[in-house]
């Protein structure tokens, strides 16, 4: 600006003002003319005429001149008029009249051109604003103005601070408009710009993270994806932003109304048998709809009844746990193209990002209820902690699946450890598989493909022979079971594998199914979340919280907060409670209490490992959520994987970001940790497992990994309760300005330049944060976790436990093999209808009449399976019995399969159930030396078979310690032989029946037993 006399100085601003007013009048006139055009009934036919397009172009030019001439006073107004009159109103007009616009018509072509032109204009405007004001947005967006490198310096900018602020926000709004235009493009046929629109919105957030408007647009873009859960997350983020968008409240309200309608429709829908793929889709739909409905009830102004809320919380937790077992490309389900088509309308698994969003939704709900002083605050806290417990448990299961890949399962009935050297040798010989590039579950597929059941091998050998006339029965048709389709797929899958014979040991079939035998329900009540299905029964109404909640949760609870603390403990106890009543065969409980390597070392005084004191460890709960085996340290595993393999598994685990965020939130709320320490014990048990799975800082520092200096510096403070510094991770950037994490994010400088971390370095930073949190919790009062530096592990301890940490660590080492098997079992049970089975179990086996009159364990013989398979199937699907299949019975079916179609049907049925993981049908492996009656086998095969089955019954009911229950009435052998006239039976058979009676084992004809069961009802 040239220096001139005072009159000249005063005249220039005056001329600028006059020019500005003249421009503004021209803009208003153009807007008025465009409004007249849009008022016509046939406006959609007129809007793209050349004169109207020219008018819009003129208005656009005037608005651009106006905003740069006087940005402070007219910039925002000019932006708004430009967007609404030139682009938005035209778009809305076309969308309103889309029924009149035919595909590939001239109007549709003009509309597409309109959208493309808008995107081009706003990209150009974005670059021009950056260039004009020399904005540095390289770290925020793709379309940046790059300073001329030949100049070596920036152009001087004479703009005021207010003008610079407008320019920054104008770039933000340009990105939002670009996202909107891409979203409108995405609605057109043949155009897929959803990811582009999403990217523009996130770039707008990076430019102005305090503005919530882009989250509202992201919610609109998400639509009904994942039954509106993704949209709900976006609308909640918008509402909880510093500058929220009013429209998000109405959008969220509409989603909640939809969720309530869908929830009641699902409750009314009849339960019918579905194929495995459809079951998965229905389970996930039920989870997401119920989760949406639950969040609508957990609102500050909600008037829901406490009992309804508690029941719904428990139902959602059950389904959440179940659906986390559903993994992409799960080998157990063997989905064909037909199955995938069935699931096209639904979802077959929960992606990691959706689980992350569900976790953040819970945190946002807790924050809203706390701020409003709602009575549902305690319920929300308890639900969130329980959900986090499930999340950690599944992270443990997935990580252990990777770290223990290739390890041979340990037989559940083996107590002498004779096969251990063979297992170790097999492990040493096996080459490690390459790690999957993306998701962890795919690693399971490689391992599972090498496992074939013995029945699969029998059928595979038979396939080499030419088909006979009677072989039509091999087709898997005519089965009423839900798993018939799955059975066929499983059979085909097994036939496609290696033809290597398993005659020698039969380990693949027996090891997998025997480990499932170890999943029977315990008599004890563990304080965990694993039996939520049992809690579907009407729950106690929790005491209500105070109507007012203090603003801050940080710091110790004062006397005035006692009611909140007691209410929170009560709700947390309800969420983590279990109601289990099943008579466990003594063999199972004794094996759980006594490790295979040192049977007598912990039989009397077993230390409290990870919080379970004086209770048998639980391999798997009824709803599939509990792998309390995963609640002991995996670092004790005898087959340690290399650090590189550990890091590969950790990098591939997509749930770790959610865990890290949860722990950041808990770190800023230590009072919640203390109040819920005892009621949520399984959460800390599982956290101790995760902490022990992670490599320690010394291990990482000594490994020689190529890490940047910032990460190396972070490793030095990894084992401290408070990290001296912290590096920003993608999850931290994504949750910037989120109110529940505001306190946790105070240590971050979001505006400073941050190093670009590799995937490995990001994983190391997460490891540092999680292990530092472990030391932070160990420092809190209440002995929630303790760290033993001697062996380098975290241990979760009950307050009343006085055993030394070293003893507890040793106990964890001894139980490592059991834990590994249990977690493998939990992965393999994904396709079960777990919650239905548990409710059946509790509704039937807890009835005194049924419990006393009928044995819970049934062992059918070969004749029963050959000639009465439909009855066996009904007994198995009733949920009132557990069918045990001894090895002898399988051998008998193998001998009869060539002559008896019933034997082939039995083989097919058992193979399908074992592969599916049915908890009500188990295979039992022979263990130890039994008295071989070779002469009897030649003379009377039926009597010999009964003796062999009786040996299996003894293994099942054998009490290995004092004080066990009387095994009488626990097991019944159901046979296809007629027992009405014992005198008509052979001498050896009569002797076998007497031996069974002496062993307190009932032997009944299958028809008589079935009739008796039906009469009892």
UniProtKB/Swiss-Prot annotation:
Residues 448-467 have a biased composition (Basic residues). GO terms for biological process: nuclear-transcribed mRNA catabolic process, nonsense-mediated decay; regulation of dephosphorylation; regulation of telomere maintenance. Changing residue 166 to L: In strain: Czech II. Residues 486-496 have a biased composition (Low complexity). InterPro entries: DNA/RNA-bd_Est1-type, Est1-like_N, Est1/Ebs1-like, PIN_dom, TPR-like_helical_dom_sf. The modification N-acetylserine is found at residue 2. Interacts with TERT, PPP2CA and SMG1. Part of a complex that contains SMG1, SMG5, SMG7, PPP2CA, a short isoform of UPF3A (isoform UPF3AS, but not isoform UPF3AL) and phosphorylated UPF1. Not detected in complexes that contain unphosphorylated UPF1. This is Nonsense-mediated mRNA decay factor SMG5. It comes from Mus musculus. The gene is Smg5.
């Amino acid at each position: 600006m040239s220096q001139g006399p005072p009159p000249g100085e005063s005249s220039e601003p005056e001329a600028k003002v006059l020019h500005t007013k003249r421009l503004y009048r021209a803009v208003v006139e153009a807007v008025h003319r465009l409004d007249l055009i849009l008022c016509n009934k046939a406006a959609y036919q007129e809007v793209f005429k050349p004169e109207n397009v020219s008018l819009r172009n003129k208005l656009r030019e005037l608005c651009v001149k106006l905003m740069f001439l006087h940005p402070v006073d007219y910039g925002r107004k000019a932006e708004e008029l430009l967007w609404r009159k030139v682009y938005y109103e035209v778009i809305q007009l076309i969308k309103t009249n889309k029924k009149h616009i035919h595909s590939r018509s001239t109007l549709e072509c003009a509309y597409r051109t309109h959208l493309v032109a808008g995107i081009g204009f706003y990209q150009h405007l974005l670059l021009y604003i950056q260039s004009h004001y020399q904005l540095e947005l390289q770290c925020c967006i793709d379309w940046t103005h790059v300073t001329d490198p030949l100049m070596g310096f920036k152009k001087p900018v004479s703009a005021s601070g207010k003008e610079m602020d407008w320019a920054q926000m104008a770039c933000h709004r340009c990105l939002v408009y670009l996202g909107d235009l891409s979203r409108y493009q995405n609605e057109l046929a043949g155009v897929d710009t959803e990811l582009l629109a999403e990217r523009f919105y996130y770039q707008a957030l990076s430019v102005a993270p305090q503005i919530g408007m882009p989250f509202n647009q992201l919610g609109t873009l998400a639509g009904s994806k994942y039954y509106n859960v993704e949209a709900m997350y976006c609308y909640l983020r918008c509402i909880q932003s510093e500058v929220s968008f009013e429209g998000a409240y109405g959008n969220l309200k509409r989603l909640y109304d939809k969720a309530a309608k869908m929830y009641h429709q699902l409750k009314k829908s009849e339960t019918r048998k579905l194929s495995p793929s459809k079951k998965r889709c229905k389970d996930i739909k039920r989870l997401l709809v119920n989760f949406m409905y639950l969040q609508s009830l957990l609102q500050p102004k909600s008037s829901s009844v406490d009992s309804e809320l508690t029941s719904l919380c428990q139902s959602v937790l059950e389904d959440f746990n179940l659906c986390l077992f559903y993994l992409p490309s799960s080998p157990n389900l063997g989905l064909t193209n037909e199955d995938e088509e069935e699931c096209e309308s639904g979802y077959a698994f929960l992606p990691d990002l959706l689980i992350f969003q569900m976790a953040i939704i819970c945190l946002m709900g807790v924050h809203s209820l706390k701020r409003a002083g709602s009575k549902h605050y305690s319920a929300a806290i308890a639900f969130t902690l329980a959900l986090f417990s499930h999340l950690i448990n599944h992270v443990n299961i997935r990580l252990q699946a990777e770290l223990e890949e290739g390890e041979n399962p340990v037989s559940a009935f083996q107590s002498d450890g004779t096969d251990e050297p063979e297992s170790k040798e097999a492990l040493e010989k096996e080459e490690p598989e390459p790690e999957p590039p993306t998701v962890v579950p795919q690693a399971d597929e490689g391992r599972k493909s090498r496992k074939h059941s013995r029945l699969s091998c029998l059928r595979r050998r038979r396939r080499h022979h030419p088909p006979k006339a009677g072989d039509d029965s091999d087709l898997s048709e005519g089965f009423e079971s839900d798993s018939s389709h799955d059975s066929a797929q499983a059979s085909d899958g097994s036939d496609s594998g290696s033809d290597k014979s398993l005659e020698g040991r039969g380990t693949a079939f027996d090891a997998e199914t025997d480990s499932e035998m170890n999943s029977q329900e315990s008599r004890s009540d563990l304080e965990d979340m694993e039996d939520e299905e049992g809690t579907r029964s009407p729950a106690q109404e929790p005491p209500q919280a105070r109507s007012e909640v203090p603003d801050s949760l940080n710091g110790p609870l004062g006397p005035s907060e006692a009611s909140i603390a007691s209410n929170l403990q009560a709700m947390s106890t309800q969420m983590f409670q279990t109601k289990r009543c099943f008579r466990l065969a003594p063999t199972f409980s004794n094996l759980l209490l006594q490790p295979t390597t040192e049977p007598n070392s912990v039989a009397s005084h077993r230390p409290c490992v990870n919080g379970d004191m004086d209770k048998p460890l639980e391999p798997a709960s009824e709803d599939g959520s509990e792998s309390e085996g995963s609640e002991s340290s995996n670092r004790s595993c005898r087959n340690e994987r290399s650090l590189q393999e550990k890091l590969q598994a950790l990098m591939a685990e997509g749930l770790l970001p959610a865990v890290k965020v949860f722990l950041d939130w808990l770190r800023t709320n230590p009072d919640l940790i203390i109040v819920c320490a005892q009621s949520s014990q399984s959460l800390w048990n599982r956290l101790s497992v995760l902490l022990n799975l992670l490599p320690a800082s010394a291990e990482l520092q000594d490994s020689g990994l190529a890490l940047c200096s910032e990460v190396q510096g972070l490793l030095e403070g990894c084992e401290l309760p408070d990290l001296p510094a912290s590096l920003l991770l993608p999850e931290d950037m994504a949750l910037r300005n989120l109110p529940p994490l505001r306190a946790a994010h105070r240590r971050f400088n979001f505006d400073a330049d941050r190093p670009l971390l590799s995937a490995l370095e990001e994983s190391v930073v997460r490891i540092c944060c999680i292990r530092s949190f472990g030391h932070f919790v160990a420092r809190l009062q209440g002995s929630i976790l303790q760290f033993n530096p001697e062996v380098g592990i975290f241990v979760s301890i009950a307050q009343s436990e006085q055993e030394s940490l070293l003893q507890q660590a040793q106990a964890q080492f001894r139980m490592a093999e059991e834990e590994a098997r249990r977690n493998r079992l939990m992965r393999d049970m994904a396709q079960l209808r777990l919650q239905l089975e548990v409710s059946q179990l509790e509704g039937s086996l807890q009835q005194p009449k049924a419990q006393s009159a009928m044995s819970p364990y049934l062992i059918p013989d070969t004749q029963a399976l050959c000639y009465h398979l439909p009855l066996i199937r009904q007994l198995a699907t009733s949920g009132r019995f557990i069918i045990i299949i001894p090895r002898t019975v399988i051998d008998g079916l193998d001998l009869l399969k060539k002559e008896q179609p019933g034997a082939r049907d039995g083989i097919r049925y058992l193979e399908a159930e074992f592969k599916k993981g049915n908890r009500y049908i188990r295979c039992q492996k022979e263990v130890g030396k039994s008295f071989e009656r070779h002469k009897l086998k030649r003379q009377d095969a039926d009597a010999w078979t009964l003796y062999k089955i009786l040996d299996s019954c003894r293994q099942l009911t054998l009490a290995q310690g004092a004080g066990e229950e009387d095994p009488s009435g626990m097991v019944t052998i159901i046979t296809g032989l007629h027992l009405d006239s014992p005198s008509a039976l052979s001498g050896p058979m009569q002797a076998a029946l007497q031996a069974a009676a002496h062993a307190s084992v009932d032997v009944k004809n299958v028809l008589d037993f079935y009739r008796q069961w039906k009469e009892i009802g």
